Structure formats: structure tokens, C-alpha cells
Amino acid sequence: MTIIRKKHPLIKIINHSFIDLPAPSNISSWWNFGSLLGLCLAIQILTGLFLAMHYTSDTATAFSSVTHICRDVNYGWLIRYMHANGASMFFICLFLHVGRGVYYGSYNMIETWNMGVILLFAVMATAFMGYVLPWGQMSFWGATVITNLLSAIPYIGTTLVEWIWGGFSVDKATLTRFFAFHFILPFIITALVLVHLLFLHETGSNNPTGLNSDADKIPFHPYYTIKDLLGVLVLLMAFMILTLFFPDILGDPDNYTPANPLNTPPHIKPEWYFLFAYAILRSIPNKLGGVLALILSILILALMPLLHTSKQRALTFRPITQTMYWILVADLLVLTWIGGQPVEYPFIIIGQTASITYFAIIMILMPIAGMIENNILDLD
């Protein structure tokens, strides 16, 4: 009798994706983040669904409904904080996943990589709209500042902003549509994730050496299901410690004050995972220039296959580019710190220097380092 998982039209797809999938025998824990992101997405959709049952997307009651969830709904406080901190865990996994892709040259799988960049934009858009929903001070002013950036687009900017707002300011219409988009986008993201996996399984996974691993494959189950399970346990432990012991550590105290259009907070800043991009935006005095730099700071990932000059795929055996890579990581941490600081000396100049360094490393220094390493190889 043939095994059902190999013959059933639906189970067969799952089998080829998660059970009998040929995987390289040497992939490290850096390859765990794909499954962890899937877990984060599932947690966010599930907790979000329960929050949506009690939330009201009206400016008069939104803040109160979130308070009601935390105080009156059974385990509402847990669901709310799981959802808020789940977003942070999602972005930690995302950044590590992208960082792994850059380090090991996974961007050479162009379709998979570009789908990943689209996913990153979609997740960032979803998180931004979600942050607006509690209708606290930072929700309101964050929405006002970020949507206002679109007014920098020549000719159609102002019309576009008013169209997104549904009026002449961020108000009831804006909140309602943001809730609608925030609800539907995770399901679109789930569909895009399936396309991301489809493209990945066309080529097979990369590995730490960057070499072809067709001659040395092992089945995904049980080897990598067990390995992923360890990652899941570590993530869930960190997640529950964060949620149960330090639920507000990554949030902004200003968001516990109801939105007030007449009172601007002293420092308007987004959630921690957007601070690096926010720092790049603020480092350019020109509005349109800042918006373009902001978009390019993420879109530059899509250019990485074009900027690859090395004969080797991964950075495993490339010490010069490795140095550039870790300087880039440090630079992103500096940008994250600067994004949360006020716009004054010396933070302005540090932010501008870090922004220039960010683009210079990716667009100039890493490609040059790749060419130098090629020449060193040719000398042998």
C-alpha cells in the first residue's frame, strides 16, 4: 500500500515542502529563522483575530476599547501584549533572516530574494498601520508624520495625502481604513510567503559554504523539523519572558495618553524596529530627498544581486567583505540609536555620517572588496 502523503493531491504538496524536501546537510541555525517567521506570523494572525473581536475602529472609542481588552476581557492583557511584543519578535527574526541572506549570498536566488523584499515592505506597512490602531498620542502623531511624507511627491503629493487620510487630517476615516488594511494584509502576507517558499523550492536552499550541495542532501524531516523545534522553544521562551515580565519595555509611554491633535509630543518616534529607517529619513534636510533615502534604505536590498562582484557566493571565506559586513551591522545599530534621539547636535551629524556609511558600504565598499578578493584569488 502506497503512503498517503506521497499520493494524496493536497498532502503531497505538504510532503514535498516539509517532509521529503531534500535539504543541504550542513545548514546552520541561521537557517532556522524561516520557520520562526512562520510561527511569528501565525501568532500575530491568531492574537490579532481575538483582538479584532473586541476592538472598535472609531476615534471616540478606539483607546477605550484597547483599555477594555486589557481590563475586562479574559486574558485580554495577555493577548494584547502577545500581539504588541509578537511584532517585535517578528522584526528581530526578520532582520536576522535578511542579515543571514546578505552574509551567505542568498540574494543570488533572485526570485526568492525579491519576493522577500516585497514581504519586508508588506510587513513594515502592516506594523505601521497596527501601531496607529490603539489611538494613543504616538499612534496619532506617528500616523500624521509618516503619511505626511507622501506630500513630498511632486504635483500629486497633497492630493494623495488627503486621499489616504479620507479628509484634511488624520481622523475617523483614517483609523477605520487603517484597521481594514491591518486586518487584510497579514493574509496577503501569508499568500506571499507561500510564493516565497515556492521560489525557494525551485532552486533549493543555500548553505554556509555557498557551494552547490546537490551531491549531499538529507530529508527535511526528521533532521530539520527537530532542529527547527529547538529554535521554536528558544523563541517562545524569549517571547514569553518579554511578554510576561517586561511587556512595555519596547513600547512608548506616550501611547498610554489618548490621541490629542492639539498637543504634540516632545519627541515623535516610531517603534524601535523602524528607527534605523527613521534616522536615515531625518538625516537629509530636504523632504523629498529624505523620503527617497527612506525607501532606498530598504529597496537597496533588491539591488544586492547586481552589486555582487565576488567569484564566491558567501562571505565565509572572504575576510575583507566580512569586515565590511560587520561594520554595516554596527552602523545599523548606531542608526537605530540615533532614530530615538532628538534632532540636535551631536545627533544630527552622527545620523548623517551613519546614513552615508550605510549606503557607501553596500553600494561602493562591499563590491570593491569583492573585486580585491577576486584579485587575491587570482594571485595564487
Swiss-Prot record:
Keyword Transferase: no
Main location: mitochondrion
Signal peptide (from-to): none
Record SUPFAM superfamilies: a domain/subunit of cytochrome bc1 complex (Ubiquinol-cytochrome c reductase) (SSF81648), Transmembrane di-heme cytochromes (SSF81342)
Sequence positions that bind a ubiquinone: 201
Entry's Gene Ontology cellular component terms: mitochondrial inner membrane; respiratory chain complex III
Binding site for heme b b566: 97, 196
Summary of the function given for this chain in its UniProt record: Component of the ubiquinol-cytochrome c reductase complex (complex III or cytochrome b-c1 complex) that is part of the mitochondrial respiratory chain. The b-c1 complex mediates electron transfer from ubiquinol to cytochrome c. Contributes to the generation of a proton gradient across the mitochondrial membrane that is then used for ATP synthesis.
Protein name (Swiss-Prot/TrEMBL): Cytochrome b
Organism: Microtus lusitanicus
